[in-house]
A protein has these predicted regions:
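Short, well-ordered coil/turn elements that cap or connect secondary structure elements
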Residues: 1, 72, 93-96
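Conserved beta-strand hairpin/beta-sheet module of binuclear metal-dependent hydrolase folds
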Residues: 1-43
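Short secondary-structure boundary micro-motifs
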Residues: 1-2, 8-9, 60-62, 87-88
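Solvent-exposed, well-ordered amphipathic alpha-helical segments
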Residues: 17-19, 43-51, 91-95
Length: 97
């Protein structure tokens, strides 16, 4: 069964998790990594089960912790080609590898 949770949504940050068979994907990382971990724990999700992060776009309220997530976990961050093109400066600012 698929489990999901809205970890937060709004102008201050956005993040969602989807889990199936103890494997998860994180959609957006608009909070600090510490806040994301806390929100996951508070909602009964395991941070270590995250396989990858998918970003809807590169505004900070969706991608704030993307660079930190990638560097600390070594896991992939996926961004659509259109978002990459439109957000070249944001990729640098967010330090996404």
């Amino acid at each position: 069964m698929v489990r999901y949770s809205v970890l937060g949504s709004g102008s201050c940050g956005n993040s969602y998790i989807f889990t199936y068979d103890n494997q998860s994907i994180l959609i957006d990382a608009g909070y600090s990594l510490k806040q994301i971990k806390e929100r996951l724990s508070n909602n009964g999700f395991d941070y270590d089960s995250i396989l990858a992060l998918f970003l809807t776009h590169l505004h900070p309220d969706h991608a704030h912790a993307a660079g930190t997530f990638a560097r600390q976990t070594g896991k992939s961050v996926y961004v659509s080609p259109v978002a990459q093109l439109m957000g070249k400066n944001e990729i640098k600012k967010l330090n996404i590898p």
